[in-house]
Amino acid sequence: MNKINCFVPFSGAAQAEKTVKGLQETGLVNNIYLLALPDVTENLPGCSTLHMQSIQSSAAIRDIAGHSDAEYTLIYTKYTTLELGLFALERMIHIAEDSGAGMVYADRYQVKEGKQTNAPVIDYQFGSLRDDFDFGSVLLFRTDTFKEAAARMNEDEYKFAGLYDLRLKVSQNESLVHINEYLYSEIEDDTRKSGEKIFDYVDPRNRDRQIEMEQAFTEH
């Protein structure tokens, strides 16, 4: 039952191998795509690499849509190790099917220096338009919804607001459902080797980013 294509940020094998192994062991995964900067040359067994300039860009979202050929599309948005809870993906699929949601997201734990803290998220209200709304780092979309929303995305090529634009498009026609359960953990390991290339973190106050978010919001 390979129902999910997964898309995972990738800077090198050490950073992503535990995340990939955990996804592969669920038995629900069709393909895993590693999202990497153009000069990243490493790979992981059983995965394909998609090279892109920014994981948040419109081009990245269209690329993901073009490689989404399973029933569900999972995007993981962090470089930290993802550790899924028991039957977490089954639970997400079950609720997506029962609710008819276009996207589901869940509460999670964050583990830093061995210390676990709860990191709950809140229910999405229609009209929750803030670009900093916290969905957590695991977003599970129905693929038909994802593709349809990506096809309606703003023709402007966003560098920073692609994922935000997609989320706004999904919310226009579909529900975004919060699963009020702790289904996964984000585990901070400092496995990154010096010089390893990652997508640049962009400060939310960055002016270019703010302008793009405002454009996406206005167009919505």
Q: What is each model feature region?
A:
Residues 18-30:
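Short, acidic, metal-binding catalytic loop of nucleotide-sugar glycosyltransferases
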Residues 52-68:
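Glycine-rich, basic loop-to-helix element that forms the pyrophosphate-binding segment
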Residues 69-83:
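Short beta-strand-to-loop acidic/aromatic patch adjacent to the donor-nucleotide binding site
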Residues 81, 86-119:
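Conserved donor NDP-sugar-binding/catalytic core segment of glycosyltransferases
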Residues 117-145:
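A recurrent flexible, glycine/aromatic-enriched loop bordering the glycosyltransferase active site
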Residues 145, 156-182, 187, 217:
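A short, conserved alpha-helix in the catalytic core of glycosyltransferases
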Residues 180-202:
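Active-site donor/metal-binding and catalytic loop motifs
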Residues 199-220:
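C-terminal, non-catalytic tails of nucleotide-sugar-dependent glycosyltransferases
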